[in-house]
Structures are given as C-alpha cells and as structure tokens.
Amino acid sequence: MKTNKNKLKLELPWDKYSDQPYVIKNKVLKKQIYKKVRFDSLKMLLVNILIWPLAVIAFFLPAKKRKVDTKQFFGLGVNLGKTNLAKMQSMVDDLGCQHLIIRIPLHDIENLDKYVHFIASFSDKDLLINILQDRRHVENHILLQKSLSKIFDACEQYTQNFQIGHAVNRKKWAFFSMDEYLAFYRVAYDLKYKHYPNLKLMGSAVIDFEYYFTIRTLFNFYPLKFDRFNTLLYVDRRGAPENKQMGLDLRGKIKLLHAILRLSAKSSTDIVITETNWPITETFPYAPTSEKECVNVDEYAKYLLRYYMLAYSSQLVSQVYWHQLIAPGYGLVDNRDGLSKYPAYSVFKCMLKLLSGCKFVDFKVDSNNLYKVSFENTQYDIIVCWCLQKVTIDTLGKQVLSKEGNNISATKIVLSDDPIYLISDKA
C-alpha cells in the first residue's frame, strides 16, 4: 500500500452550483501536472497505437447483442441535499424509476453517516453507489483503503453495486493519469476479493467520447478486472444525439466501445452509461458547461427520449442513468425557487410508464432520417418515432401520444424531431 511522497501543492475546490470541481486554470500547475505524468502519457500513447487498428477491425465484425431488459434499463441520479427527502422520494415514486445512482464523495467521507442515511431511504430501489475520488485519496492508498472499507461496510446491506471513480480523464476530478486511476481502482479490487466477494465493481468511468483513455484502462498489466464497464457518454457538445463525431452517432459510439471491450480481458462487455444529460440555457452558474453547449428545455426533453431510444436500440447497453433528478442547470427539476419540473420530467415519466416491461422488436432509420424504435408487450405494439426532417405519416388505426403522453387526434401527422408514440392493440 503506497502513499505519494511527490505531492503537488494544489486544491481542487468544489463548485456547489454544477456539482463538480472547478476547472484548473493555473497554467503553472497544469505544466507541473503534465510533467509529473509524462511517462504515463507515453504508455497511453503506445497502447493506443497498438489497439486502435484492432478496435477498428472489431467494429466492423458482427457483435453479439444483449437481450436488454426494459425493466432494468432506465435509471436516474439522485443526490443528497437537493430538497426535502420526502419530496425527493415522492418524485422518484411518481416517475416510477426503480434504478438509482447515488454519489458518495470521498472529500466528504467524514460525513459518511448522512450519505448512508440518504441511501437507506431508497432501500426499496436497485441502487448503484458512485464513489467520487479526491486528491488526498488518490495520493494516499492507506487512507483510500480505510475509506472504502467504511463505505462498503456501511452500504453493503443496501446494494452490492459500486462505481469506483468518476470522470477519470478530467484532471479537475483529481486523477492526473490513467495509471493513477488504475492504481486507485486496484485498492478497491483487492478489498473486494479479500473481504467483500459479493460486491460488483464498475469502472472505468471515462467521460465523453474519449476512448483513448478508455483503451488505457482496458489494456494494462494491473491485476484487476471490471465486473461491469461504465462510461459517462455525453454527446451534448455535438448537439443532438444523432449528430456525428468522427463519423459516429450515439449508436456508433456505443458499438465502438463494445468492440474495444471485446478485445480486452479486463472487463465484461456489460456496458452501463452512468451519466448523461444536456446543459440547460440561461441557468448560469448551475449549467456545467458554457452557454454555447446549452439547449432550451424543449430541446432537452426531445434529446432525452431520443438518447434513450438510440442507446436502447443498440442492444449493447444494459442501463442508462440520467444525471440527475434535481439540478437547475441540467436536471429534470429546478430547485432554485421551490421545485419546478422541467418538461423533461413528464417525458421521463411517460417513457418509463409505456416502455418498462416491453420487449425490443426493431430499429429502423431511412434516408429521410426517419427513426423508428419498435417495442411490444402482451397487450400492444408501440413505436417511438421521430424525423430530423419533416415528413407526413399515416396514423390510421393507431393511438398517437406526444412524448409527454398526451393524446394527439389525427389520422395524418407531420412528424418532426419531436418524438411521438404510435400504439396499436394486438389482434
């Protein structure tokens, strides 16, 4: 067990508005950090040179799809201190969401009891605990082992699922290299196999479409393995989830990640998206990005449903957790002046009500960018559809619902980027 004697003198202050550390702006400090991890960066470069050609080949090979359970697929983040606990519980129940991710920040480990109380209040749900790193625990593995043991001991009665680390490729989040993260994760991994064999540990928690970091966490000589593999797959900087980056839309990015996982012995191919959203315009300082990336609340609601449908239709992702229930700058509910539900709240609720328990049937997209994701259950067939261009479709014999679940009475409808549900009873 090691402690780091070559510590940099730094603080990574917390932004209480956007629920993340502030960006490191000190240029001298940045230079010191890059110098400190230059050898780790070289290793990452060499690994990527070796793996990327194989990943591209694997991308074009057939992949075994999962039978993704819609009852398990839809998840949501809830954080301590956002509002009265009873009100938060009421909203979670109103949404019908059974799968929650809850943060425990190591920078506040001295107050672990209040997080455990919060977790216990949702003990009737399927819980995933997200352990957020801080610099002192990255540098002091003896302290890390003690803190993780406290968390595992306190939470094991409520869940066996733990995400180890968060946004590991952002230096403001306290990891300066992937080697630092891997050494950090190994402490948790060793604890699991010595004392907590029933736990399921999740990593590597890379944020955004930056798979060169992902590759380093999957191809290394550290004695560890991820029971499930998570990613914080934001696409907000590209706008809509269908927009492409390096030739890949959201489904393509998921397929590439799965291809990389198939090459590695360090993880299962069980992919979980543990965080995604869009920042909301005119909510500074609560939005986690600049105003340039922000969208209005109507776009946010459209993107939420389309993101879930694209991710689910890949049949390569077992769960997606939306970040998060209450957050003025990026959540489903604004708590700046009481509790005000954004339009996306109703969209999330309707999505769970209609689709939870359904089976996946098909995904189609045509040359007009008309998207159709088809589901079925014992009572009805349902199609979620939208079009990036405007096109008129025939809805005769089908019930038409808006993304919020409101009835639309029409035999023909002009379909746009605003998704609708087409529902027909089984014969």
Regions found by a protein language model. Give the residues of each.
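Carbohydrate-binding surface patches
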Residues: 364-398
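Catalytic domains of carbohydrate-active enzymes, especially glycoside hydrolases
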Residues: 74-109, 126-128, 157
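Hydrophobic faces of well-ordered beta-strands that scaffold small-molecule active sites
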Residues: 72-78, 100-102, 127-131, 160-164, ...
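Aromatic/acidic polysaccharide-binding cleft in carbohydrate-active enzymes
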Residues: 275-349, 364-367
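Noncatalytic carbohydrate-binding groove/subsite architecture in carbohydrate-active enzymes
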Residues: 178-307
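Substrate-binding cleft of extracellular glycoside hydrolase catalytic domains
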Residues: 123-183, 273
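C-terminal beta-strand-rich structural cap/linker in extracellular carbohydrate-active enzymes
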Residues: 48, 407-427
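Distinct, well-ordered alpha-helical segments
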Residues: 85-89, 112-115, 140-152, 208-224
